[in-house]
Structure formats: C-alpha cells, structure tokens
Amino acid sequence: MDVLELYRRTGALLEGHFLLRSGMHSPFFLQSAALLQHPLYAEAVGEALGKLFEDEKVDFVIAPAIGGVVLSFVVAKALGARALFAEKDGRGGMLIRKGLTVNPGDRFLAVEDVVTTGESVRKAIRAAEARGGVLVGVGAIVDRSGGRAAFGVPFRALLALEVPQYPEEACPLCREGVPLEEV
C-alpha cells in the first residue's frame, strides 16, 4: 500500500507553512481526516495497520479523539477487537468515558494517524492503563518522529516520513514571509 499516494490522492498532503501542535513549523501537513473520510481508504489503512499487529492478542484498540476515532474503529475491525477512544479531560490529560469497556488485564493497541512527538497517543495510553488495560503496541499510519518516538512496546507505522520541522527562530519559511497556518 502506497500510503503517501493515498494522502496525495485524497488531498490530505498539504503544502505551505504550518504551525504544528508541537510548536514546530513545517512546509508540509498531513490532514488525515481528508483521507479517513473515504470509507474504502480508511478500511484499507485499518487492515494494513492491523496486519502489523495480527500476532498480538488485542482486546481493544484506542486512539485520541476526535481524529483517531475512525482509525481506532477500522483497526479494531481488522483485528476483531473493540474500538475505544480517549477524550481530553480538561486538565491536560485524557479519559475514557463511562460505557466504554476496559476490563483489568485487557490487552490493547494504541493507534494514531500521525506520530510526531507521540504525546497525544501517550495520553490515550495513560487513560487506558488507568482503567487496567495492558499496552501491547502502538501503531500509526505515519511516523514523522524521525525515530524519536518510543513507547516501551513495539511501535510500527505504515510509513516513516522525514518531514522538515523548524523552531520558529530558525524557520526559513518565516524568513521568506510565507504566511503561517495553524493546524
């Protein structure tokens, strides 16, 4: 599966000057929602990501809301597991709402569309572990961490992508006067 081509085909690979959640600037942004809005593409991505973890016995798949809800669902479907999501708790962390089942000892896979620092998925992991879940792996459509994201369990992605990132003070796009878009 050519993941980068799917991003291009669906208009999910944006070019310009972007302020990332990490505070870094980048000439590219991967708008995964534009890809995952297409059920056939979403399902194909979910199946491919699920295959990377098919040997793990996974009870549920969790992702940070809102962006990860679709991804959690399609990966869980591929693995025959439950699909959960974690929401912001208003205190800088995440929580799993009542009604979503996590049994003590349940094995889970955490997924994210794009991992840059891994902080969002870490918050979802902490929410699941707080309910007794046991993390067995982390999956992503795209790893743009440059190998810096580590979770203490297998971390696998469909695509490792080196995308330039700059702190504001060293950003060539700022120096060129390219308008900054917050994403």
From Swiss-Prot:
Protein name, please? Orotate phosphoribosyltransferase
State the family named in the UniProt similarity comment for this chain.
Belongs to the purine/pyrimidine phosphoribosyltransferase family. PyrE subfamily.
Q: Which PROSITE patterns match?
A: PUR_PYR_PR_TRANSFER
An example of a Gene Ontology BP annotation on this entry? 'de novo' UMP biosynthetic process
Q: Does the keyword Glycosyltransferase apply?
A: yes
- CDD domains linked: PRTases_typeI
Provide the assembly information.
Homodimer.
Q: What gene is it encoded by?
A: pyrE
Which Pfam families would you find in this protein's record?
Pribosyltran
Keywords associated with the record: Glycosyltransferase, Magnesium, Pyrimidine biosynthesis, Transferase
